[in-house]
A protein has these predicted regions:
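Helix N-cap/coil-helix junction residues
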Residues: 24, 171-173, 195
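Non-transmembrane alpha-helical segments in soluble domains
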Residues: 69, 73, 92-95, 136, ...
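GST-like fold's C-terminal all-alpha helical module
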Residues: 98-187
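Short C-terminal domain-edge/linker segments immediately following a structured domain
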Residues: 34-36, 60-61, 84-85, 113, ...
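Generic, ordered loop/turn and secondary-structure boundary motif
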Residues: 12, 62-63, 82-83, 151-156, ...
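Long hydrophobic alpha-helical segments typical of transmembrane helices together
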Residues: 177-204
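GST-like domain detector, emphasizing the conserved glutathione-binding G-site
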Residues: 1-122
Length: 204
């Protein structure tokens, strides 16, 4: 299998954590790329042009980080990260909340870089920031439900928190100030799970 990836994307990191958790590193070749390069191999067969993108051993292409993560989870031998028990929907719901935070963040980051900072756009960006602040605090209020078990929701929330620290100068939110207990929880998860610690974002 081949995974087209970057070292900074929280979506890619989600997939890399799954790979590390299931010790699939020897089965997945990492192909570093930049999504915007039109002649990158992953863009030749990837209509979305996004990363991560996974090419299976059968030559089939899989798109979307959650789909790729679930596919790799199905191949793994360790504890499943997509639980099928009574907490199935709760885990997926927390994952969806983390996904919403990233959608809000990427929306205003893109607009901030592309558009002038008129009063209207500034107001729109501030609205997205305030939504993220509310959502981080919501997650902090539900730490008991999140627990310390590694699953697709908890690992993705850690990815989001670490991405906010990594891009804090652009995002403008410090999780340690906004939701300190949630931030400490994320750092503890990093210390406890090697698959998280070894995949932290960095600029290659």
């Amino acid at each position: 299998m081949k995974l087209w990836y970057s070292t900074t994307s929280p979506f890619v990191r989600k997939v890399r954590v799954v790979i590390a958790h299931h010790q699939l590193n020897g089965q997945v070749e990492l192909m570093a790329t930049v999504a915007v390069k039109p002649y990158s191999p992953h863009n030749q067969d990837n209509p979305l042009g996004r990363i991560p993108a996974l090419q299976t051993d059968q030559g089939e292409w899989l798109f979307n980080s959650t789909l790729i993560a679930e596919y790799l989870d199905s191949l793994g031998k360790n504890t499943p990260l997509f639980p099928q028990g009574e907490n199935h929907w709760q885990v997926l719901n927390f994952h969806a909340i983390a996904d919403g935070i990233m959608e809000n963040t990427l929306m205003y980051l893109g607009e901030r870089m592309l558009r002038d900072q008129s009063e209207w756009w500034h107001s729109r960006h501030q609205q997205m920031i305030e939504r993220n602040i509310r959502t981080l605090r919501y997650l902090e209020q539900h730490l008991d439900q999140l627990g310390n078990e590694l699953n697709i929701a908890t690992l993705y929330i850690v990815c989001v928190i670490d991405f906010f620290h990594f891009r804090q100068n652009v995002i403008g939110i410090d999780p340690a100030d906004i939701a300190p207990r949630l931030d400490r929880w994320a750092q503890e998860m990093n210390r406890h799970y090697t698959c998280l610690a070894d995949t932290k974002p960095y600029q290659a």
